[in-house]
Amino acid sequence: MNIVQNSIFLSNLLRSSPVFELKYDHSCELYRMSTYSTFPAGVPVSERSLARAGFYYTGAKDRVRCFCCGLMLDNWKAGDSPTGKHRNLYPSCSFIQNLSAVSTVGAASQPPAPLSEARSTHAQSPGLERSSYFSASYSSFPVDPVDFRPSPAMSPWRAGPSCVTMKSEEDRLCTFQGWPLAFPLPSALARAGFYYVGPGDRVACFACGGKLSNWEPDDDALSEHLRHFPDCPFVEGQLQATVRYTASNLSMQTLAARSRTFCNWPPRAPVHPEQLASAGFYYMGHSDDVKCFCCDGGLRCWESGDDPWVEHAKWFPRCEYLIRIKGQEFISQIQASYPHLLEQLLSTSDNTEDENTESPIVHFGPGEYHSEDAVMMNTPVVMAALEMGFSRSLVRQTVQSKILSTGENYRTVNEIVSDLLHVEDEIREEEKERAAENRESDDVSLIRKNKMVLFQHLTYVLPILDSLLMAGVLNEQEHSSIKQKARTSLQARELIDTVLVKGSSAVTIFKNSLQEIDPMLYKRFFVQQDRKYIPTEDISDLPVEEQLRRLQEERTCKVCMDKEVSIVFIPCGHLVVCRDCAPSLRKCPICRGTVRGTVRTFLS
């Protein structure tokens, strides 16, 4: 028998309200709430917050389960946030994603998503307040399938008349002299249009008269106002004044949410959390790493005197949040103060560094390395991986990569072991490539390593093609296929790739043909070994059409030969590939140096 159907009170309530048509399954928040009738009394987490986070009671100890993703949690401790734990442990859950979306200003302006996260409740009429059902442990109906918006037909939830005397935010703020809670801040409530009416934590909107109470720490005043009273004229005015922008992390869109992430901010860090949160940054939980909620740009290694807004504009000038708050003029001034930022970045890299030298991915400040390294490497999960026999240096580098990319350490042994095995496979593949290169003849290895430079400057392709055809290196089909390419650079690329595939004998014939047909290029490439700075031909005397064609070739990606180059490799500084081809390259195709990082450029 269904629990809700067994309840006389709930049945009478549903029959008396024609608006309500309740589903009898765990997707309904009211139904989930009804499963907590036998929930242990000593658990330090409220049944209401568990039901709101998508959990229903399993009947065993304090174990609960998500109706959507199946996540089971127990052993609740004081201070635990059911919504936060749900989001952290199973972020792909569609229910918890909807909760996150509703909590933002942008999302709240849309029709309410099912089972929203808001923890405040409409003020109840005296008749309903006397009922134990509408206690602090549960405070809202589900949005779907129940119509939860205030309407004249639902008198217990009807918004009161507007209060013209509270139109001023300052006047509203003065009413919070006896505010009983530390959250939300009175300034945030007043800014959201509310003034304090009591009793308890009840507030009312000056414009629509809507009343809310039973506030919890995670509540955002404006988001709650939007969710419960979307037709409020004050809310509509706020939405019209809001410039929409795309946020990379919706859960960090509010200042309060970002500020809460700084609870473990290093006390000796020279920049205050308030400054960082105001500039759009939230704390990643490691060292002094922060990220912008909007553009996802990350910054670290803060120094005394750093201004978060200036650093934001310096490194991420296209951030929509930055542009909206500070304006384009401020960003342009900061950018003008650092005209050679890209050159400085490239100059700090050592071009002569051995590609096999192990370099740490995360750079710690003075005196921080040993303590943070110890914390990072001595978690139970990491220690378990070390006990399996993985190299400590390999584990350290893998953990650092994880922290750098996600802001947190590994949570499970399976996850870290999977990544370690993947890294070992990559290392073995690189060793095989090096061994294969060593087995090849010197000429084959030379051309393979520098083929990008060679085919960029190989202009006499057709005579060499004919020579290789006569020598039997190419057949008629290969000769015709290469010859039909529209541009010389494409012909050169396919010719060299074909020769390399055929092996050392084909390379020898190609080398002899090049010596005969283009002795200048042969001398510079094979004799002088001047492969880094082969001068380009003076094209000033060529026809304008030919000059344009060659300039276009120089700006074309040397991998796909289609899109425009836009990625600079670090540390070598070569600009030869587009943004789509760059992620697949571990080594620069020009100098064969290991790619440590990339910078996107915009050619004017």
From Swiss-Prot:
It is an enzyme of class 2 (transferase). SUPFAM superfamilies: DEATH domain (SSF47986), Inhibitor of apoptosis (IAP) repeat (SSF57924). Its main location: cytoplasm. BIR repeats lie at residues 29-96, 169-235, 255-322. The keyword Glycoprotein does not apply. The keyword Electron transport does not apply. Residues 439-529 form the CARD domain. The modification Phosphoserine is found at S140. It holds the Pfam family CARD. Signal peptide: none annotated. GO terms for molecular function: cysteine-type endopeptidase inhibitor activity involved in apoptotic process; ubiquitin protein ligase activity; zinc ion binding. GO terms for cellular component: cytoplasm; cytosol; nucleoplasm; nucleus. Auto-ubiquitinated and degraded by the proteasome in apoptotic cells. Keywords: Apoptosis, Cytoplasm, Metal-binding, Methylation, Nucleus, Phosphoprotein, Repeat, Transferase, Ubl conjugation, Ubl conjugation pathway, Zinc, Zinc-finger. Zn(2+) binds at C292, C295, H312, C319. One of its GO terms (biological process) is apoptotic process. PANTHER family: BACULOVIRAL IAP REPEAT-CONTAINING PROTEIN 3, INHIBITOR OF APOPTOSIS. Interacts with PRSS25; the interaction inhibits apoptotic suppressor activity. The BIR motifs region interacts with TNF receptor associated factors 1 and 2 (TRAF1 and TRAF2) to form a heteromeric complex, which is then recruited to the tumor necrosis factor receptor 2 (TNFR2). Interaction with TRAF2 is required for ubiquitination of IKBKE, degradation of NFKBIA and activation of NF-kappa-B. Interacts with RIP1, RIP2, RIP3, RIP4 and USP19. This is Baculoviral IAP repeat-containing protein 3. It comes from Canis lupus familiaris. The gene is BIRC3.
